[in-house]
């Protein structure tokens, strides 16, 4: 259980650490903010590609082995990023890191499941993963100011090494022993995946660009990091809370409330009003996006008890695809007169539109 929480929490730092440092990295590499968005895209290309192989590998060989491979990839990739060898090598390094972050999410959650964790503990795992991303948004900007542009990378490598300790101590966990039937075309899983995309996926897109949005509105890097970090960081509270509520509130109602709340929070950010209004928007978006995590993944595992790891992977892959496509597109919005606000208006609309697949999802 501890190993799963460590793997999920430490390696999801990589999801938002670059977005938190977007402006300094743009200056260092001599590229636009939209190009910096490609560093996140490079990560999520491999993060997406490894989802199903990691899930099937966890089902067949055990989640501990997959987790250790993920940790090794994160360390190697961030070591490459620490080299000052240009933007092209940075893209390669982020792609290697993506193998680690993608496999880590699946393996970490499956470690919790294999250890006997139900909806409440899986919600706690979700909170741990949000902690990593949220803390990166809050800590990396001032740490970069105090040190250098390398801050996102050396911190990520150190956290990956930290996650290795409890993972190496895991023993005796049950595993499925086979990869299960192929889940890619499972029509019952896809609506569940759409809900994960509309909550976690869009929240990560928003979290990656909230800091530069607020900086362009006049906030300091520290204030923007603290406010923008709320989008991911407050999931520490609502993901476990959603797990506790899973047995007390109808899953469909819980997810509907989350979608409406996320849409409202993104809309507040899109308005470009006073800093306090944008901060409230970040808070509301983060609280809402974290709420349905346990409901969504518990439903995925119930749908495919023959391949729980692969089911986790497919549902999360839907969110990763959203991040992969949405992050660079959101970056392009910063080249428009709206200074990025248009991206958050679209996020608000997409969150609300997910009420449609909610009707088809078996929760």
Task: Indicate where each model-derived feature is located.
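Helix-to-loop junctions at the C-terminal end of transmembrane segments
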Residues: 50-62, 238-250, 334-335
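Helix-breaking motifs and short loop linkers at transmembrane-helix boundaries and internal kinks
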Residues: 30, 62, 83-88, 272-273
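C-terminal transmembrane helical hairpin of 12-TM major facilitator-type secondary transporters
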Residues: 250-296
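Extracytoplasmic gate region of multi-pass secondary transporters
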Residues: 18-19, 188-236
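Cytoplasmic helix-loop-helix junction between adjacent transmembrane helices
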Residues: 93-129
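A late C-terminal transmembrane helix in Major Facilitator Superfamily
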Residues: 306-339
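Conserved MFS/SLC helix-loop-helix module at the cytosolic interface between two early adjacent transmembrane helices
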Residues: 49-85
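Helix-loop-helix hairpin linking two adjacent transmembrane segments in secondary transporters
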Residues: 89, 117-118, 123-171
């Amino acid at each position: 259980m501890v190993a799963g929480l460590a793997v999920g929490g430490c390696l999801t730092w990589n999801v938002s650490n670059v977005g938190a440092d977007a402006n300094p990295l743009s200056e260092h590499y001599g590229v636009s903010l939209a190009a910096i968005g490609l560093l996140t895209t490079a990560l999520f290309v491999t993060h997406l590609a490894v989802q199903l192989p990691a899930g099937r590998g966890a089902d067949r060989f055990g989640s501990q082995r997959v987790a250790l491979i993920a940790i090794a990839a994160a360390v190697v990739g961030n070591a490459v990023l620490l080299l000052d060898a240009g933007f092209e090598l940075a893209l390669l390094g982020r792609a290697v890191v993506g193998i680690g972050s993608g496999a880590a999410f699946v393996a970490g959650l499956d470690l919790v499941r294999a250890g006997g964790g139900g909806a409440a503990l899986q919600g706690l795992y979700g909170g741990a993963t949000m902690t990593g991303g949220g803390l990166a948004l809050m800590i990396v900007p001032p740490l970069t100011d105090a040190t250098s542009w390398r801050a996102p990378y050396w911190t990520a490598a150190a956290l990956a090494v930290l996650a290795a300790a409890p993972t190496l101590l895991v023993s005796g966990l049950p595993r499925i022993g086979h990869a299960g039937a192929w889940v890619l075309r499972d029509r019952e899983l896809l609506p569940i995946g759409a809900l994960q995309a509309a909550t976690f996926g869009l929240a990560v897109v928003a979290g990656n660009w909230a800091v530069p949005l607020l900086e362009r509105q006049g906030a300091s890097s520290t204030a923007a990091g603290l406010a923008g970090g709320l989008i991911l960081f407050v999931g520490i509270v609502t993901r476990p809370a959603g797990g506790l509520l899973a047995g007390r509130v109808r899953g469909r109602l819980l997810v509907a409330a989350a979608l409406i709340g996320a849409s409202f929070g993104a809309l507040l950010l899109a308005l470009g009003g006073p800093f306090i209004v944008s901060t409230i928007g970040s808070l509301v978006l983060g609280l809402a996006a974290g709420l349905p995590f346990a409901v969504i993944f518990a439903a995925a595992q119930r749908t495919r008890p023959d391949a729980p790891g692969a089911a986790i992977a497919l549902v999360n892959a839907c969110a990763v695809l959203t991040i992969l496509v949405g992050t660079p597109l959101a970056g392009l919005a910063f080249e428009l007169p709206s200074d990025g606000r248009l991206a958050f208006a679209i996020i608000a609309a997409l969150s609300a539109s997910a009420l449609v697949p909610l009707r088809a999802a078996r929760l």
